[in-house]
Every structure is written in structure tokens, then in C-alpha cells.
Curated annotation (Swiss-Prot):
This is 3-methyl-2-oxobutanoate hydroxymethyltransferase. It holds the Pfam family Pantoate_transf. The gene is panB. It catalyses: 3-methyl-2-oxobutanoate + (6R)-5,10-methylene-5,6,7,8-tetrahydrofolate + H2O = 2-dehydropantoate + (6S)-5,6,7,8-tetrahydrofolate. Binds 1 Mg(2+) ion per subunit. GO terms for biological process: pantothenate biosynthetic process. SUPFAM superfamilies: Phosphoenolpyruvate/pyruvate domain. One of its GO terms (cellular component) is cytoplasm. Its main location: cytoplasm. Catalyzes the reversible reaction in which hydroxymethyl group from 5,10-methylenetetrahydrofolate is transferred onto alpha-ketoisovalerate to form ketopantoate. InterPro entries: Pantoate_hydroxy_MeTrfase (IPR003700), Pyrv/PenolPyrv_kinase-like_dom (IPR015813), Pyrv_kinase-like_dom_sf (IPR040442). It comes from the Bacteria. The active site is at 180 (proton acceptor). The keyword Transmembrane does not apply.
Length: 263
């Protein structure tokens, strides 16, 4: 199997073929996902909550991300692997470059950073130094204390601001964008306005791809279950079948449905 590259996702967008991605944090699950056909994975700072048991992503460190990136890379050597730069790991462009080097050496193909137009210089510096960047707009969990909780973003006038941010990130060199917890109508506008692939989570079925935290996809999330989550394991019966069902429902547009979407 050839390594998956960003060009595959560009082709999917051009051909209007939806694609499924998922978070992964260790060797065994990464191998399972790869074996069942998921070729894009994210080592997310969500590990702070799902793996480490914190109530937010803020305690996660760059070394935490690098550790899990190494494990996932061993399990899925040919996947396109995105890794988050965690809270305060990219406060300046120079700091972003230093920390991106750590996770890239650990096996990442691309780094994901949260924020809008204020990141333009950072995105430029990273891409000029051969570090591919995935942006992240909407509900950005590292900003939970600014937002006052995990709330829907991009309603009303904020929608145009988010679209402007997305265009600015693309112009700066970002090659992917994650949209989290935004109205379907806004997600559609952003996806159509950008030439780069847009991956949604809580953004309806109008984006180019979808991502889920693996614990949500398997129904093993403790505490609050997000509206956009679906327990594929409950219907499928085993983990491999659940992964295949998740992929099939994303690719056909069945998931996410109206019950998983915001307006």
C-alpha cells in the first residue's frame, strides 16, 4: 500500500467523494483503523480528556502528542497522519516551528493548529519550512475558557468572520481545514468557498470529509455525549464492523444526519 498524501484528499474534494477520518492514540487502534481502510488519522489533543482523564485539552504537552504520534505511526505506517500542536505550543511562529519539528520527527505528516487570521504568519512560516498545516475553526477546544464552555460557533455575524478566517488560512498556505460545531449552512459556505478539503465534526454532512473522536464512534466516552456523536459499535456489534459502518455512512452521506447537525 502506498502512503496516503494530501493529494488524495484534494482529489476526493474535486470528485465530490466524501471521506472518513478518525482520531487515534495508540498502535493497536491505529492498526485496526488502517486495516479497515481509514487512511487519514489525527493524534488529537483530545487525548487529554479521552486518554489522560482531564476535563479539557489544556494540560496536554508537545511530548504527549509526540509519544502518541510515534505509537500511531507504528500501527499505521502508510496513513496520512495529522498531529495537534497543543495549547500554547504555537504562541509565536518561531515556537510553532520548534514544536512542529518535534511532532514531525515523531511521524506526523501535518500539524493541526486552532485559530483564525491571527495565525497567518505562523501558517506561512510553517509551510515555508516544509511543515504542512491543517487549520481548525469553529469550536476550538483550546479556547474553552474564552468561549465559556463547549458551544456552537459561527451563528449570525460570526459566520462571516469565520469564513474570512478560513480564506485567510488557505491563502497563508493551509492545506486542510477542520470545522467543528458550526451550523450546516455555514459549513456549506466554507466548504464551497475553499479549494482545500474541509473536514467536519458537528458541521453536518456538507463538508468534504468527517472526523470523529474514536471513543465517540465506539460509544465509550464518559460523561457528556456530543450531539454530533454516533455509537457505531452499538449497531455493528464489533469494532471492525463499526469502523466499516462509519466509513460507509460518511461516504454515502447518511452520517452525520439531521439529528447530529446544528442550524
Amino acid at each position: 500500500m502506498k502512503p496516503t498524501t494530501i493529494s488524495l484528499l484534494q482529489k476526493c474534494k474535486q470528485e465530490k467523494k466524501r471521506f472518513a477520518t478518525i482520531t487515534a492514540y495508540d498502535y493497536s487502534f491505529a492498526k485496526l483503523f488502517a486495516d479497515e481502510g481509514i487512511n487519514v488519522m489525527l493524534v488529537g489533543d483530545s487525548l487529554g480528556m479521552t486518554i489522560q482523564g482531564h476535563d479539557s485539552t489544556l494540560p496536554v504537552t508537545v511530548e504527549d502528542i509526540a509519544y502518541h504520534t510515534r505509537a500511531v505511526r507504528r500501527g499505521a505506517p502508510n496513513c496520512l497522519l495529522l498531529s495537534d500542536l497543543p495549547f500554547m505550543a504555537y504562541a509565536t511562529p518561531e515556537q510553532a516551528c520548534e514544536n512542529a519539528a518535534i511532532v514531525m520527527r515523531a511521524g506526523a505528516n501535518m500539524v493541526k493548529i486552532e485559530g483564525g487570521a491571527w495565525l497567518v504568519d505562523t501558517v506561512k512560516m510553517l509551510t515555508e519550512r516544509a511543515v504542512p498545516v491543517c487549520g481548525h475553526l469553529g469550536l476550538t477546544p483550546q479556547s474553552v475558557n474564552i468561549f465559556g464552555g463547549y458551544k456552537i460557533q459561527g451563528r449570525g455575524d460570526a459566520g462571516q468572520m469565520l469564513l474570512d478566517d478560513a480564506l485567510a488560512l488557505e491563502a497563508a498556505g493551509a492545506q486542510l481545514l477542520v470545522l467543528e460545531c458550526v451550523p450546516v449552512e455555514l459549513a456549506k459556505r466554507v466548504t464551497e468557498a475553499l479549494s482545500i478539503p474541509v473536514i467536519g465534526i458537528g458541521a453536518g454532512n456538507v463538508t468534504d470529509g468527517q472526523i470523529l473522536v474514536m471513543h465517540d464512534a465506539f460509544g465509550i466516552t464518559g460523561g457528556h455525549i456530543p450531539k454530533f456523536a454516533k455509537n457505531f459499535l452499538a449497531e455493528a456489534g464489533d469494532m471492525r464492523a463499526a469502523v466499516r459502518q462509519y466509513m460507509a455512512e460518511v461516504e454515502s452521506g447518511v452520517y452525520p444526519g439531521e439529528e447530529h447537525s446544528f442550524h
